[in-house]
Curated annotation (Swiss-Prot):
Homohexamer. Forms an RuvA(8)-RuvB(12)-Holliday junction (HJ) complex. HJ DNA is sandwiched between 2 RuvA tetramers; dsDNA enters through RuvA and exits via RuvB. An RuvB hexamer assembles on each DNA strand where it exits the tetramer. Each RuvB hexamer is contacted by two RuvA subunits (via domain III) on 2 adjacent RuvB subunits; this complex drives branch migration. In the full resolvosome a probable DNA-RuvA(4)-RuvB(12)-RuvC(2) complex forms which resolves the HJ. This is Holliday junction branch migration complex subunit RuvB. Transmembrane segments: none annotated. One of its GO terms (cellular component) is Holliday junction resolvase complex. GO terms for biological process: DNA recombination; DNA repair. It comes from Nitrosococcus oceani (strain ATCC 19707 / BCRC 17464 / JCM 30415 / NCIMB 11848 / C-107). One of its GO terms (molecular function) is four-way junction helicase activity. It is found in: Cytoplasm.
């Protein structure tokens, strides 16, 4: 990946984990954005706590960087219980999951990131654990092997995924609470940027926070990452204060434009417009054209372009919309303006 793709990638960098942890809100009262999720959890969590019960199992899904891990920490904090954290790829054998489950305290939260990547044999162990609070484990080998049931304490499983469609129906149906995280509105990102600036002890003008928020692709993780790079620029090239002008210059230096697009976003859009005449084009063809992996396009680049209306999915493949043409100052091709898109621009 290029430097600026790293800057606007919603994927978490290993070096960011400690910084991100210090910036995460610990309580629902400090949680910004996702109003529907917040409103629901403000009912479910106190209800479970008042009854001294484990919260129902929670599935959180949405694009990377929107706060799935943060929300899991908040759930544990609000329930005043321990959080045990792991990920789907780490749980290679049923015994790995059994070890975690049998060491939980009553009402603890077990957080499994990338839960769609659980192996089928591990997932089979999870079903009775979620539903009946029991697991079956094998003791011994060969003819002497036998299965025994272990009772588990009440617990809450919080599963997070960017690919909810890859979850099996039996697993998905066992979650009593399902929360979808959406891209953040600019005004919510401004609040997040201002909060982070206060924690980092930065001097920032409102317009500076707005400029960073506008270019953050609706993603808090990207907003915080860009803020730290703007701080570097302000301290070296300015007086340390983040103004709108300072933010603009810093983000232009990082090649992040006013829409939050970086080189790879523009490369993908231009490939659709110039090499494939606006589409429709398959993802594999796009991946080959821009030298990127299919998974990166589907999970990292494409979601924001779809949400912003620059790309649309059709049964025949991806198509560029009129927004994409206008962004590059090109005249939309007639065949590239389907009726449902054309109706949005009656005066053009």
């Amino acid at each position: 990946m290029t430097l600026n793709r790293d800057m606007v990638s919603p994927q978490e960098d290993r070096g960011e984990k400690a910084v991100e942890f210090s910036l995460r809100p610990a309580r629902l009262a400090d949680y910004v954005g996702q109003p529907q999720v917040q409103e629901q959890m403000e009912v479910f969590i106190p209800a479970a706590r008042a009854r001294h019960e484990a919260l129902d199992h929670v599935l959180i899904f949405g694009p990377p960087g929107l706060g799935k891990t943060t929300l899991s920490h908040i759930i544990a904090n609000e329930l005043e219980v321990n959080l045990r954290q792991t990920s789907g790829p780490v749980l290679e054998r049923p015994g790995d999951l059994a070890a975690l489950l049998t060491n939980l305290e009553p009402r603890d939260v077990l957080f499994i990131d990338e839960i769609h990547r659980l192996s089928p044999v591990v997932e089979e162990v999870l079903y009775p654990a979620m539903e009946d609070r029991q697991i079956d484990i094998m003791i011994g080998e060969g003819p002497a092997a036998r299965s025994i049931k272990l009772d588990l304490v009440p617990f809450t499983l919080v599963g997070a995924t960017t690919r909810a469609g890859l979850l099996t129906s039996p697993l998905r149906d066992r979650f009593g609470i399902v929360q979808r995280l959406e891209f953040y509105a600019v005004d919510h990102l401004v609040l997040i940027v201002e909060r982070t600036a206060r924690i980092l002890g930065m001097a920032m003008e409102k317009e500076g926070a707005l400029e960073i928020a506008r270019r953050s692709r609706g993603t808090p993780r990207i907003a915080n990452r860009l803020l730290r790079r703007v701080r570097d620029y302000a301290e070296i090239k300015g007086d340390g204060q983040v103004t709108r002008q300072v933010a603009q210059k810093a983000l232009d230096l990082l090649d992040v434009d006013s829409h939050g697009f970086d080189t790879m976003d523009r490369k993908l859009l231009l490939a659709m417009l110039e090499k494939f005449d606006g589409g429709p084009v398959g993802v594999d063809s796009l991946a080959a054209a821009i030298g990127e992996e299919r998974g990166t396009i589907e999970d990292v680049i494409e979601p924001f372009l779809l949400q912003q209306g620059f790309v649309m999915r059709t049964p025949r493949g991806r198509m560029a919309t009129r927004h994409a043409y206008l962004h590059f100052g090109l005249k939309p091709a007639v065949k590239m303006v389907p009726q449902e898109v054309s109706d949005l621009f009656p005066n053009e």
